[in-house]
Amino acid sequence: MRHRKSGRQLNRNSSHRQAMFRNMAGSLVRHEIIKTTLPKAKELRRVVEPLITLAKTDSVANRRLAFARTRDNEIVAKLFNELGPRFASRAGGYTRILKCGFRAGDNAPMAYIEFVDHAEATAPAAEATAE
């Protein structure tokens, strides 16, 4: 019986799932928006949101926990230097999922997952280059 078992299996074994979400979390932190299937986006939210919460308080212990979950020093640096301070005043809900139709090959529902302030973070840079 599967009573109280949370999370989607996504037709993968546990190590494949863990590696996939570790890579997807790194891509989301690096690019701040990625396109994936809707079920993967919903599960990725459960991985990324605790990382942002961890990054809000900068300590050696939190950096080591973040590294254990991402295995990438570049991602840890961006989490603690940029994303943690950016979301310091927000109490959760750091990501947004936008549905974007269906994939051509297998009709899988697709979605963008991004950080909620992604538009505001990129808009000033675009204005600065226009001037």
Swiss-Prot record:
Keywords: Ribonucleoprotein, Ribosomal protein. PROSITE patterns: RIBOSOMAL_L17. One of its GO terms (cellular component) is cytosolic large ribosomal subunit. The keyword Acyltransferase does not apply. One of its GO terms (molecular function) is structural constituent of ribosome. GO terms for biological process: translation. It comes from the Bacteria. Pfam families: Ribosomal_L17. Belongs to the bacterial ribosomal protein bL17 family. HAMAP family: Ribosomal_bL17 (MF_01368). Part of the 50S ribosomal subunit. Contacts protein L32. This is Large ribosomal subunit protein bL17. It comes from Sodalis glossinidius (strain morsitans).
